[in-house]
């Protein structure tokens, strides 16, 4: 009797790799017999022994068996299987008769081939959207290859990286000079013989790194900052010298300080023709909208995502012990000493409520008579003591408030009024009285960089509670997001902010920057700051165009402000569009969607999210082109998403969709920096979620911040404004009163357990954690990012592999330089014969060694699972929807 070939056990961890299709069994058996003269049974030749659990398992050619091989459980009806899943989109006026009973797009994607050669050609929608995205990202130079800072040979990295084993507590520059044996002359022997000055754990020579030149002990910054940090040794003049020296060594490249030639102007015009027009963007946008509104595609996506979630659970059951063993086999590396990046830490909320109260209380006791504010209209000067006289009765002591200076009432007012009405327009004069005036002065003095004391308090806060803490931890890093502010007097915000950074030496290895843009065109229009939407864009981008085109000589006479601004921009990673529930929504007149920005007045109506995104994208594409020509880093685009799922978008003419969908589709097409909110993605159509998975677009989750913000939708301050505050109704009632909104849509409240980031992590989306705004998080520790990971680990029972994968993803998706990514997680953009990982559907990152787990402690078994599962999904898509060649 002929023996039956048994299939490997489902209990094996390598089942998926060792599975054999039924029709391949006989061929395999014949090959084995021919190689061994037929004397040995094929089962004896198996390198892997069959377990006892397999004795009752016989390979049967069933439908389920075939689908397990394909990795697609029973998601489709047999009729659909026979027809190869027929929700294939066909563009009716480009693809023959367009006969498809499930989805026929009435919109033609831009630059799609037309003519007889495309007749009866079916399009794979996933591949088509992928090529759309690649076109937009490549045209704006947001991809990793176009960004010179990922080139470790050409990029000017300054300050020089710290040594591999550097530790904050071992750096002698930060130690008390009384504890050192060195005297002022460098004599450590007592014999009078001078020895070389070698301060710190790292001892480079003077000729290789000027950054560690000898300085006497003591703080190099200004003010009363009492904590040490590496940035106090930053020297702008030294940066200028080394920067110019680096440029002189670059052969056959355009110098960033040389005149902007006419040849480059022609290159710019040629480059900008590659940027899709607004009409092309509208066509592509409409195509994706129809795609995600297809019931068939949403059903397929829903089942595939459910399959991915269940597959990860099965993978965990089968491989959790192997992952734990692999974690333990990596010496000297765990979650705590793996790099992790907070990619969206808000400068306006970078410290906790307790820390801010303690800092203000300390200043009140140390310098109560210091002048900290001057009224722009009356020139009246106020001291710290004077600030607390506002809102106090005659029987109260102005400073008898104690450590409850920053209470929930202030936080509500700061978030809902100050950040919206005053922070974004610094020139606006506040006509407030009472407690509201005290709140305004506290925010202006302690939480603004452009004020009477030149932002000294905010600089001290940032150094003491952010930079110092991050540098001491060494393994925690942050991309700090700062709001772009609009000056009615035409002042350059970039220049002001870079001057503030360099004045107080807010430079650190652990800090990079993001620039956030708010949708406040109606507000600026009402205040006569701008007269059309183009002027709004000019306020943001004209200073950057001027900087990149300015004619400057290559010598030490270069303007220090220009060099300082260039240094700041070299540390900018992303430009973000902030989309909030409070953004003005209702229109007075319905302007044509194709109206150009210079003609968009519309009585101050707010342009749609898509208008903001496209024209910011287009301007950023020009900036990136100029910067890449000048050997400077390029900047990626990111965006938030509307928290309301019930607000209809005004960008649709023939199609109806929400603001959430509009924001997500814009991110899908225009952004390579990722999505800054996870909740709206989870609440929308499953087709969009599946596209974000297939393209591996980075997503940021801030569970603690999202819970804290959404739980206080109706703030205490707004409820009790008439009781708590005194308003000056005589001077300016519009300023004093809070205008009621006609918008009755209310975002639903969330709890931490309902945050979707964990499910998305299991599915395989490129997700990472952020602390975002610590001021509203009720943070209880000095390390809010670790606190974010710890809370997630406690609630969801994350294992070390999960935590290390989240931290590794945060580094891979961050805007840090390629040198640091290679050093921290062992990846680079240059092609290598090792493991390859795609980010955003655009950038391929290659491992620099065969096994890089020593750097990040993510086992290869987890990384292979993610890679093979993603490849399997793309194979599924191509198998069921066809494959097309590149269109662009």
Curated annotation (Swiss-Prot):
The modification Phosphoserine is found at residues 9, 41, 178, 180. InterPro entries: AMPD, Metal_Hydrolase. Residues 1-42 are annotated as: Disordered. GO terms for cellular component: cytoplasm; cytosol; mitochondrion. Residues 23-34 have a biased composition (Basic and acidic residues). It comes from the Eukaryota. Gene3D superfamilies: Metal-dependent hydrolases (3.20.20.140). Keywords: Phosphoprotein. The keyword Phosphoprotein applies. Present with 1100 molecules/cell in log phase SD medium. Belongs to the metallo-dependent hydrolases superfamily. Adenosine and AMP deaminases family. This is Inactive deaminase YJL070C. It comes from Saccharomyces cerevisiae (strain ATCC 204508 / S288c). The lineage of its organism: Eukaryota, Fungi, Dikarya, Ascomycota, Saccharomycotina.
